[in-house]
């Protein structure tokens, strides 16, 4: 049977989600538990592979098992063995043809920034610190230009290996907070470092060093050298995974054009 698991984690002490040859990862923690329960290796398949230091309010993975265990018992068993910086929120049995990555229709990220005269040690690893004043209105104007279907070659890591760098963004906005701002972005999928590059560009806009009018040209240029900065990982949160059309239409309306993945090569 196939089991779907909904989790959250504080990513500061992880080298990312995906298992590494050395170092602590989220995948490693779960596969260690499943190996102990099954007495053999059990691979998990996530909806997203977050990078080092990135957090998740919501993340899904699935695995196959021949153990006859109720969902609530799976949840209890995992939470009993997990460290304090990971929590299993929900477990359910799904159809054997369901694939956590392939059937993912969208993701929402939130990037948190606080502004102050000096760095706050209690925000370390949780939010990104910026000392300068920012023009939120101009930042939001620029953020809106990213909504739609575009080739984001110029706004991702040059290490990105996927064939197509075309992604559809349903939401891209700056939300002012008491301490600074959040950048909230929802899309069909995201390229390596894409959200962090978008944030870095928007911060430059807020400082008056870049302009919203540049976005169209930069998207067409597809040149990462024109957008050289990447925001730190510490402020980034995977906030929501969209596994059904209903989830997307609930948030964005029935007229939304849903982008479907053609292969597992997409994020």
From Swiss-Prot:
InterPro entries in the record: PsdUridine_synth_cat_dom_sf, PsdUridine_synth_TruA, PsdUridine_synth_TruA_a/b_dom, PsdUridine_synth_TruA_C, TruA/RsuA/RluB/E/F_N
Active site annotation, chain numbering: 51
EC number: 5.4.99.12
Keywords: Isomerase, tRNA processing
GO biological process: tRNA pseudouridine synthesis
UniProt entry tagged with the keyword tRNA processing: yes
Catalytic activity: uridine(38/39/40) in tRNA = pseudouridine(38/39/40) in tRNA
Pfam families referenced in this protein's UniProt entry, alphabetically: PseudoU_synth_1
Source domain of life: Bacteria
EC category name: isomerase
Molecular functions (GO terms): RNA binding; tRNA pseudouridine(38-40) synthase activity
Binding residues for substrate: 109
Subunit structure: Homodimer.
Sequence similarity: Belongs to the tRNA pseudouridine synthase TruA family.
Function: Formation of pseudouridine at positions 38, 39 and 40 in the anticodon stem and loop of transfer RNAs.
Name by which UniProt lists this protein: tRNA pseudouridine synthase A
UniProt organism field: Staphylococcus haemolyticus (strain JCSC1435)
Organism lineage: Bacteria, Bacillati, Bacillota, Bacilli, Bacillales
């Amino acid at each position: 049977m196939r089991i779907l698991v909904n989790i959250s984690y504080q990513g500061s002490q992880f080298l990312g989600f995906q298992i590494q040859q050395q170092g602590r990862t989220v995948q490693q923690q779960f596969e260690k538990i499943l190996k102990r329960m099954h007495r053999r290796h059990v691979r998990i398949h996530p909806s997203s592979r977050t990078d080092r230091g990135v957090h998740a309010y919501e993340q899904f993975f699935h695995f196959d098992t021949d153990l006859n265990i109720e969902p609530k018992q799976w949840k209890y068993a995992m939470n009993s063995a997990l460290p304090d910086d990971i929590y299993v929120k929900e477990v359910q049995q799904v159809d054997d043809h369901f694939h956590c990555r392939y059937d993912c229709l969208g993701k929402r990220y939130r990037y948190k920034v606080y502004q102050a005269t000096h760095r706050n040690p209690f925000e370390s690893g949780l939010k990104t610190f910026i000392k300068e004043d920012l023009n939120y209105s101009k930042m939001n104007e620029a953020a809106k230009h990213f909504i739609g279907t575009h080739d984001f070659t110029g706004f991702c890591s040059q290490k990105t290996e996927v064939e197509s760098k075309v992604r559809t963004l349903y939401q891209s906005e700056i939300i002012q907070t008491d301490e600074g701002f959040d950048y909230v972005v929802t899309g069909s999928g995201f390229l390596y470092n894409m959200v962090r590059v978008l944030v870095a560009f928007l911060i430059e806009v807020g400082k008056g060093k870049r302009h919203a009018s540049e976005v169209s040209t930069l998207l067409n240029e597809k040149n990462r050298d024109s957008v050289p900065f990447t925001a730190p990982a510490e402020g980034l949160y995977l906030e929501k995974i969209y596994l059904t059309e209903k989830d997307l239409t609930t948030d964005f309306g029935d007229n939304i054009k849903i982008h479907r993945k053609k292969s597992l090569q997409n994020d």
